[in-house]
Amino acid sequence: MDRVLLKGALAELFDEGAARFDASMAELTTFRIGGPADVLVEPRTADEARVVLAACRRLGVAVRVMGLGSDVLVADEGLRCVVVRIAESLSQVEVDGERMHVEAGASNADVARRACEEGLAGYEFACGIPGTVGGAAVMNAGAYGGEFKDVAESVRCLTPEGELVDVDAERAQWSYRHSMMGEAGFVVLGATLRLAPDDPRAIRERMDDLARRRAEKQPLELPSAGSTFKRPAGFFVGQLGQEAGLRGYRVGGAQVSEKHTGFVVNAGGATAADVRRLIADVQERVRASAGVDLEPEVRMWGFEE
């Protein structure tokens, strides 16, 4: 990457300070792990996102797109690319009757709270899902019987060629932790959610119940990327880990949670190499004990570079 050329190009597009060089990814991921990214850009509008992605295409620069870093493990060596972070600076929410128009950087928790305040039900399931609406759209995030596809009417995206498109539910092809947008490399900029009117007190009670259940069962007190593996059909990852004797298993500072064996946590001082090795060990042990192949839900960046 020609850093001088790239810096000059970005300086023409954004105010000073909008692009950061050698940005710590450990500060921007929920694992609290990872080396620096060559460049970090946080667009404030959908048009800024479009412009920076177009500039990277023109310069032949590799790009990674992230939200709140809740499903990413960044290599200790960092990332030799531009990271476009769609998060707090692109997180507006507008309510129009029973619809919510949400920018991709809005957190699931904030959207669930706003929906509750407006007396709109349907997004309660996401109140404790770490990450953004953009990530939820790409991965069809779900919890406690609800999924993003259940409430999504359409998603606004940028295609890899830079075209702005609205993807309806049929075209999105949502399934378990999958969407056409993720498959095709679309960048999600926002979504329209169709919710249902309800008493805010009833909505709040449901959200509080889900929060209690999550706190009881999940290791929220330690850095992690949430559920480490996708759920294989017919099995529960936590049960598979328990039966394989993995509760508390460690590699360096990375540990299979004592609380829920479906979670890998940073128990203190873990490196990305520790986490990656631990994930591989879990896969090997579960395959040996149950004949089940676990697919990581966490995205691993920088290891192949």
Briefly describe each language-model feature range.
Residues 1, 5, 26, 44-47, ...:
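Conserved active-site and cofactor/substrate-binding residues in soluble primary-metabolism enzymes
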Residues 91-93, 153-157:
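Short polybasic amphipathic segments
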Residues 71-72, 112-115, 123-127, 140-147, ...:
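A generic local secondary-structure boundary/capping motif
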Residues 2-133, 143:
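Anion-binding (especially nucleotide phosphate/pyrophosphate-binding) glycine-rich loop
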